[in-house]
Amino acid sequence: VVAYFQPVTRVVIDQVRGVDSAHSLALLLDRELGLMTLRRAVVRPGSRAMEFIKAACEDAYDRLIYPSLEREARSDLTDAACEGAIANFGLNLKPLLMQPPVKGHVTMGLDPGYAHGCKVAVIDGTGRVLDTAVVYPTYGPRQKQEAIDRLSRLVRRHGVTHIAIGNGTASRETEQMAVELIRQLGGGVSYMMVNEAGASVYSASKLAAEEFPEYDVNLRSAVSIARRMQDPLAELVKIDPKAIGVGQYQHDMPQKRLDETLSGVVEDCVNAVGVDVNTASASLLGRVSGLNAATAKNIVKYREENGAFTGRRQLLKVPKLGPKAFQQSAGFLRVPESKSVLDNTGVHPESYAAAEGLLALCGYTLADVSAGRLADLPQKVKALGWEETAARLDIGVPTLRDVAAELMKPGRDIRDELPKPILRTDVLEMKDLKPGMVLTGTVRNVIDFGVFVDIGVHQDGLVHISQVSQKFIKHPSEVVSVGDIVQVVVLEVDEKKKRIGLSMKQVPKA
């Protein structure tokens, strides 16, 4: 039995959840102080019943008051821990959804496995499936070379430039096969390890069966892994956020509260990026503010029956998508094929008049927006005065700034401004790691006691919270988020226990 003592005011989330799971939390109060306080309140000195009331106080304290205080303290701590864990889950989920896409490349997805082999799917730059296969690189040297030969033919046939490898079972052997494949091809191809959490859940879902009725469950997961590299957000919205694997103690939390928080995070991310109504799936459209699963399916059905949308206003022809839903969703829906460039921006139709007025005031036209000739727009608005210009256009200054930003980059994807994912052509082994080595890695998970970083080895390394920053922090999320590209220095390597200790604060300054 291990005794652990900590003041209630200083207990942190993971300690509360850990203690809760062991059902061993005990509140330690000063009994004499509690009894003295109780006696002062109810015992009248000199009373004939004084001794009886004192005894009653002791009984009440031991049998009723103390257990009640303990339950209340435990409940308050657990509630606070749940709220903190839910908030942490949301903090981790957002950057995972907002990972920069690797767009427009023919991509090969590899879903590693032993008994059932490695499932392979090749998709084009739009996510359309071109080819599938199953290879068995773990069955022996001959089968491994046969797998490499088959993948090599697929790479050459379809012009594959990127390989996405799931990070689950047999991923180490699959990564080694991919590196050997790239070597035998003579370059021109790079790979990335992809978090495959939830891929198996999606592949066995009704949604996946509707999307890929002709493919086996295992091949669907390979397609999902490839698409996660091309556009993480569009693929991950198809999966229950709880299955993505970036939280702590999610099964112990109030599920309704957790679902509400995570759904809000997903919706915020989808709205921030924007959705192309002519290519988006119903799953993605259903996450846009103002739309639901039914209206999203109606948009896809209308698109299939009538061809691509040619303007935002055309959305009003979609069954069950009324004026209110249009008002709420229009600003987040993009129509690149529209004759009006404003339909491919985040400018809401209600602000089109203001946008055109702003262009006129600054000597521009919509043609200049399409051609990207608005580099001097902020300077021209500044010369006119932001508040004065907003007043002339009858909008607020924040709206004016948003409109100006959208006009300068029509069709922009805010994820493109984030650090690019790390693409590799070679693999590191744990035995290659030495204390003092400085490496670049990708943050895979942020939890209460530290940060897990993918440094290109099969095992993620841990940066303990004490090694995250030179300054004191209460939580690693104050410094890093999931998906961040960070520099780390190797502190220790334990091959037997498969543990890698890393530090961010000890990285030598350039």
Ranges and model annotations:
Residues 84-97, 103-106, 115-263:
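Phosphate- and other anionic-substrate recognition elements at nucleic-acid/protein interfaces
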Residues 2, 25-28:
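Basic amphipathic alpha-helical segments that dock to polyanions
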Residues 16-26, 293:
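Short amphipathic alpha-helical interaction segments
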Residues 5-16:
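Short acidic, hydrophobic short linear motifs in intrinsically disordered regions
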Residues 210-308, 325-355, 359, 397-425, ...:
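Long, highly charged, low-complexity intrinsically disordered interaction regions
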